[in-house]
C-alpha cells in the first residue's frame, strides 16, 4: 500500500499506567507506518504513566510527548490539534547532541493557555544540534484521536487511510471489553444508525436517519479519522469541562 499520507495521532494520558503499554503497542505495530504520534500527559499523578510515555518517546522517533498541567480530556486533545496546526514555538537549552536521549523543549509562545510544562522528543529524530534548535511541528494529512485506555486492531490506520480519498471523515465501529463484570447487551452508535460498511454518508442523509430512528444524541472523538485540512478550516476544537468530553 502507498503510505505517502501522514496520519497525526493524538493520545491524551491521565493515570492509565495499567493500560498504556497495550494502547501504545497497538499504535507502534500498525501496518501503516507513516504516523506522527503526540502523547499529551494531562498531569498524571500515578506512578508510571509519564515514565511509560517517556520510554516510548525515546524508542520511536515518530513520538512527541507533551507534559502539561491537568486540564481535562478536551484540553489534552486540543493541545494535539494546536501542535499539528503549528501554533507552538519551541526552544531548547540543549547545547550538545546526545545520542539515545530525550531532548527537552519548552514553549516560547507568550501565551500558554493549556499550561504546557515540557515537550520531549527522541534524539533519534535529529542529526545535529542545529536541527534540534530548528524543530517545528510536522505537516499531516489526517488526524485521529485515541484514548489511552483503548487500543486498535493492527490494520486500523491502513483501513482508514484506504477510505479517506474524497471524504472528510471516516467513521468506524468499535467493540467493548468487559473485565470481571457480567457482559452487558450494548449497541454502538453505528448499530443504532444501521449504516453498512463502506457507505458514503452526506450530512442530510445522516440527519434524516437520526430523525427516522429517533436518535437524539451523538458524540464523536475517537471513532474515526478526519481530514486535517477540513478540521483546520472549520476551526473546530473540543469543549472543555463538559459531560462525556
Model-inferred region functions:
Residues 1-245:
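Nucleotide-sugar donor-binding/catalytic module of glycosyltransferases
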Amino acid at each position: 500500500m502507498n503510505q505517502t499520507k501522514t496520519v497525526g495521532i493524538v493520545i491524551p494520558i491521565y493515570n492509565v499506567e495499567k493500560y498504556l503499554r497495550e494502547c501504545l503497542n497497538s499504535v507502534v505495530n500498525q501496518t501503516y507506518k507513516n504516523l506522527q504520534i503526540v502523547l499529551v500527559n494531562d498531569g498524571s499523578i500515578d506512578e508510571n504513566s509519564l515514565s511509560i510515555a517517556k520510554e516510548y518517546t525515546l524508542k520511536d522517533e515518530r513520538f512527541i510527548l507533551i507534559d502539561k498541567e491537568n486540564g481535562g480530556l478536551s484540553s489534552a486533545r486540543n493541545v494535539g490539534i494546536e501542535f499539528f496546526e503549528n501554533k507552538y514555538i519551541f526552544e531548547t537549552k540543549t547545547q550538545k547532541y546526545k545520542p539515545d536521549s530525550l531532548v527537552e523543549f519548552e514553549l516560547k509562545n507568550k501565551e500558554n493557555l493549556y499550561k504546557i510544562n515540557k515537550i520531549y522528543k527522541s534524539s533519534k529524530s535529529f542529526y545535529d544540534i542545529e536541527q534540534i534548535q530548528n524543530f517545528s511541528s510536522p505537516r499531516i494529512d489526517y488526524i485521529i484521536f485515541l484514548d489511552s485506555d483503548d487500543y486498535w486492531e493492527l490494520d486500523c490506520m491502513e483501513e482508514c487511510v484506504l477510505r479517506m480519498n474524497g471524504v472528510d471523515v471516516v467513521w468506524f465501529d468499535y467493540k467493548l471489553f468487559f473485565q470481571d463484570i457480567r457482559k452487558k447487551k450494548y449497541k454502538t452508535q453505528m448499530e443504532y444508525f444501521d449504516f453498512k460498511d463502506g457507505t458514503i454518508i452526506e450530512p442530510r442523509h445522516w440527519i434524516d436517519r437520526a430523525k427516522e430512528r429517533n436518535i437524539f444524541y451523538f458524540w464523536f472523538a475517537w471513532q474515526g479519522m478526519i481530514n486535517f485540512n477540513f478540521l483546520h478550516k472549520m476551526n473546530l476544537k473540543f469543549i472543555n469541562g463538559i459531560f462525556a468530553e
